[in-house]
């Protein structure tokens, strides 16, 4: 039986816009989402890495692990004293667990990417019998940004689970609620300090939707196109990484896990339009963008967003329209204080997209939109890498996509939308997630926040940020006010900066991966 609320919020198969995928032919009655799951939000990289370690360390010969990632550092510790992700996966492959991975091939480390790190992780695992591919089957200037772990147990499908979210297997992600940063840092904007405080999130999911998530992995694995351009240099790189020239077919899948809980989950993806096209998405897929459009079209009370970017008027347009349509709607957005790279050349294109998006929202509804950033108790800004969106405490998303045109049209992305199908008075998952992150950001108990309506909530956020601003303005006299939040102010651009930053932003930083017929429209 299909839950009515899920049917209202989720995309129908025809709304996904990708008839090339099998994923919508595997679900419940309407075929576009799966009910009967148990979803547990995991806030902070340290929380996620601990759960990942606990599940992986319990596997035995015959079990299976499938993962995708944007960046992987083999020496990243899952726990404070280890082991590392490379050691854990190496031990699994050597003990008879099937390990398959799809890592983005990436670009040179000299360009602040991670080709060397991804190659090292892939090489190490391939040497011990795993099969990890360096995958560059993306459109020009695109990337594989999906972050997924599927863990399967031979003969025990009820124990199967998946992890989906925004947390890579790499340095800088293992931070906790104190936000003092990962002891294994990575190069970053100097204003975040030597160990960047890092806010992130993922989902732990059990139930039949694990099958849909595995099918997403399988579609990419079974793509028969070359993994990279056929150049002598790329062929040498693949040889050095011990990548198989012809990846082995995936084994017959275990049965999908049985129902595990009251949560309906819809798997959303982005794949850019490219030539040759993906066999499973010939015209690309933009179900991430379409899902947000639908949810914003329903929103009446509160849209809460945590995001790394909030770029582009195209992406902000859906929230803008919701604000104009619903006079009671409030919008609260949390973003990083500074771009991750904010040099003389790298900073202006990043700020260009955010300035446009924020201006569009604030002009639509003065006084009903709040944009904030975070800092730890030492005053160091916290880099917001979480990708969370909660609408009316009913529908929420967590995954790899950011609020920018690149994530909604160009790069490969993987996000889960979730609706709690428990009886109306007991739908709590989205609300509990919101209260969990608000409690941390505002420095207040969940109980004190639970009764706030959206206008009062936005007022509280504004007053909390103002109190901290006033404390700094007064020379930090007395006790520091509670909370992490500051009013966010994007550094403006000069006319000259805007002149050259705009083409760089549109072509490189935030490219449009839609088919040409859609690019002059607001459609996805």
Label the predicted regions.
Residues 1-524:
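Charged, low-complexity intrinsically disordered terminal segments
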């Amino acid at each position: 039986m299909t839950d009515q609320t899920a049917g209202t919020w989720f995309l129908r198969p025809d709304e996904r816009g990708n008839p090339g995928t099998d994923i919508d032919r595997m679900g419940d009655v309407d075929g576009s989402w799966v009910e009967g799951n148990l979803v547990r939000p995991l806030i902070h990289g340290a929380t996620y890495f601990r759960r990942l370690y606990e599940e992986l360390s319990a596997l035995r010969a015959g079990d299976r692990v499938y993962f995708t990632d944007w960046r992987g550092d083999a020496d990243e510790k899952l726990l404070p004293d280890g082991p590392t992700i490379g050691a854990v996966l190496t031990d699994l492959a050597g003990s008879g667990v099937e390990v398959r991975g799809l890592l983005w091939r990436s670009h040179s480390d000299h360009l602040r990417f991670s080709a060397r790190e991804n190659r090292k992780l892939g090489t190490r695992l391939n040497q011990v019998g795993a099969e990890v591919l360096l995958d560059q089957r993306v459109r020009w200037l695109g990337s594989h940004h999906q972050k997924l772990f599927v863990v399967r147990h031979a003969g025990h499908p009820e124990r199967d689970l998946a992890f989906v979210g925004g947390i890579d297997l790499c340095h800088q992600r293992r931070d906790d609620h104190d936000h003092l940063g990962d002891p294994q840092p990575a190069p970053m904007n100097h204003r975040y300090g030597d160990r960047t405080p890092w806010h992130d999130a993922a989902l732990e999911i059990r139930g039949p939707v694990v099958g849909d998530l595995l099918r997403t992995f399988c579609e990419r694995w079974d793509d028969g196109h070359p993994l990279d351009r056929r150049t002598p240099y790329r062929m040498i790189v693949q040889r050095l990484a011990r990548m198989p020239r012809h990846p082995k077919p995936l084994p017959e899948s275990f049965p999908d896990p049985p129902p595990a809980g009251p949560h309906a989950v819809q798997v959303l993806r982005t794949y850019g339009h490219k030539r040759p096209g993906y066999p499973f998405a010939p015209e690309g897929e933009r179900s991430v963008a379409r899902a947000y459009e639908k949810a914003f079209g329903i929103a009446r009370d509160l849209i809460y967003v945590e995001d790394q970017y909030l770029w582009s008027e195209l992406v902000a347009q859906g929230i803008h329209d919701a604000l104009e349509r619903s006079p009671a709607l409030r919008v609260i957005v949390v973003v990083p204080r500074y771009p991750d790279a904010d040099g003389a050349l790298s900073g202006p294109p990043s700020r260009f997209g955010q300035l446009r998006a924020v201006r569009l929202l604030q002009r639509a509804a003065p006084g009903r939109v709040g944009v904030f950033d975070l800092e730890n108790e030492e005053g160091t800004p916290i880099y917001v890498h979480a990708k969370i969106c909660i609408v009316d405490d009913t529908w929420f998303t967590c995954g790899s996509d950011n609020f920018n045109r690149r994530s909604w049209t160009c790069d490969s992305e993987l996000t889960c939308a979730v609706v709690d199908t428990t009886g109306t008075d007991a739908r709590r998952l989205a609300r509990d997630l919101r209260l969990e992150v608000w409690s941390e950001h505002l420095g207040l108990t969940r109980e004190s926040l639970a009764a706030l309506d959206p206008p009062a909530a936005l007022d509280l956020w504004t007053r909390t940020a103002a109190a901290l601003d006033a404390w700094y303005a007064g020379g930090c006299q007395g006790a520091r006010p509670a909370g992490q939040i500051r009013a966010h102010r994007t550094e403006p651009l000069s006319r000259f900066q805007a002149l050259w930053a705009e083409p760089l932003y549109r072509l490189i930083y935030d490219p449009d991966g839609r088919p040409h017929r859609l690019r002059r429209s607001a459609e996805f």
